[in-house]
Design a protein with these regions (language model features):
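Class I S-adenosyl-L-methionine
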Residues: 1-183, 189-191
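Generic structural marker for isolated residues within well-ordered, non-membrane alpha-helices
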Residues: 49, 198, 214
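FAD-binding beta-loop-beta segment adjacent to the flavin cofactor pocket
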Residues: 188-211
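Short pre-catalytic strand/loop immediately N-terminal to key active-site residues, enriched for Gly-Thr
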Residues: 213-219
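A helicase ATPase "motif cassette" and its flanking acidic/Ser/Thr-rich regulatory loops
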Residues: 226
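Acidic-aromatic/histidine active-site loop/patch
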Residues: 230
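Short, hydrophobic alpha-helical segments
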Residues: 234-241
Length: 241
């Protein structure tokens, strides 16, 4: 369904899992009509959104994780109880960045050249804003591809303590971050998000995923939920006594 993907919708095997979810839910309802359910999915075309909503019998609530974290992560949430948007916690990207990062997370010159190369219409990965920077409000949306490095995992970090957030956008314009400025800028580091920073962007406790390789941590976090959003939804679930 994702606008960032191939948009195969229900023809994608992963999206077709929705019908497995629906079959399981309907089976449980036949035993327990009062069962509570919740479903999350990406931003999608209205025609697909309507199919899911009609089959579930409820309308979704659209929530951006940016309200509770430093990440722009726009998702639809369906549940068979009423719930409101979470309050804005005003978390900045700088709040999630680690101070001392191992050099292995720094991008190589080869990686930066990959970001510079023309992709479509003479534009490059910088122009498409496949990166986050500490002077913006929020980070881009982390995905399962974050482990690949460029162009999915590029953050411009600063030695000085700037308080700001980064953004998740896909439109053009380098603005003040034209990379030619950075080459002589001592204070600027072009690197990957660390797994711990990704945990913070998903409001997961530090080192919660450190029992597996970094590659698996990135995939796990990119495919996961923003914990504080889910907590907000579940906190509003009515408890029958």
């Amino acid at each position: 369904f994702s606008f960032a993907g191939k948009q195969l919708a229900f023809d994608d095997p992963r999206s077709a899992l929705f019908f497995e979810y629906l079959n399981i839910l309907n089976h449980i309802k036949s035993v327990n009509p009062n069962v509570k359910f919740m479903l999350e999915n990406v931003k999608m075309k209205k025609e697909y959104l309507d199919v899911i909503s009609n089959l579930l019998g409820v309308q979704p609530v659209f929530i951006n994780s940016a309200l509770v974290s430093a990440q722009n992560r726009q998702r639809y949430y369906w549940a068979n109880w009423e719930f409101c948007q979470p309050e804005d916690k005003e978390v900045m990207l700088i709040d999630c960045l680690e101070d001392d990062v191992d050099e292995k997370f720094l991008h190589t010159q080869k990686a930066l050249e990959y970001m510079d190369r023309a992709v479509k219409g003479g534009r490059n990965h910088w122009d498409f804003k496949h990166h986050s920077d500490a002077r913006s409000d929020k980070s881009q949306c982390i995905t399962a591809n974050t482990f690949k490095g460029v162009p999915y995992n590029v953050v411009i970090a600063f030695k000085e303590n700037l308080r700001a957030k980064s953004k998740c956008v896909r439109s053009g314009g380098r603005g003040s971050f034209d990379r030619h400025e950075w080459d002589s800028a001592d204070k600027i580091h072009v690197r990957k998000f660390t797994p711990t920073e990704c945990e913070r962007l998903q409001t997961v406790p530090d080192n919660y995923t450190n029992h597996v390789s970094n590659t698996q941590r990135y995939k796990m976090l990119g495919n996961g939920w923003t914990c504080d959003v889910i907590a907000c939804i579940f906190e509003q679930m009515p408890i029958e006594k």
